[in-house]
Amino acid sequence: LKCHKLVPPVWKTCPEGKNLCYKMFMVSTSTVPVKRGCIDVCPKNSALVKYVCCSTDKCN
């Protein structure tokens, strides 16, 4: 699986076990992603951040 890093079109190949791409938003400004990459479990939302995840190449 290949996921974008913070700024597309830069991307990396995910390590084994982290088979979801994610983009993370601050809940207060949920339009601009603050972080992108590979993740193992999703969703991992909290009071401050929201994760949007997917399981296909470069979909974040």
Swiss-Prot record:
Keywords: Cardiotoxin, Cytolysis, Disulfide bond, Membrane, Secreted, Target cell membrane, Target membrane, Toxin. CDD domains: TFP_snake_toxin (cd00206). GO terms for cellular component: extracellular region; membrane; other organism cell membrane. It holds the Pfam family Toxin_cobra-type. InterPro entries: Cytotoxin_Cobra, Snake_3FTx, Snake_toxin-like_sf, Snake_toxin_con_site, Toxin_cobra-type. Disulfide bonds join C3-C21, C14-C38, C42-C53, C54-C59. Gene3D superfamilies: CD59. Expressed by the venom gland. GO terms for molecular function: toxin activity. Shows cytolytic activity on many different cells by forming pore in lipid membranes. In vivo, increases heart rate or kills the animal by cardiac arrest. In addition, it binds to heparin with high affinity, interacts with Kv channel-interacting protein 1 (KCNIP1) in a calcium-independent manner, and binds to integrin alpha-V/beta-3 (ITGAV/ITGB3) with moderate affinity. Monomer in solution; Homodimer and oligomer in the presence of negatively charged lipids forming a pore with a size ranging between 20 and 30 Angstroms. This is Cytotoxin 1. It comes from Naja annulifera.
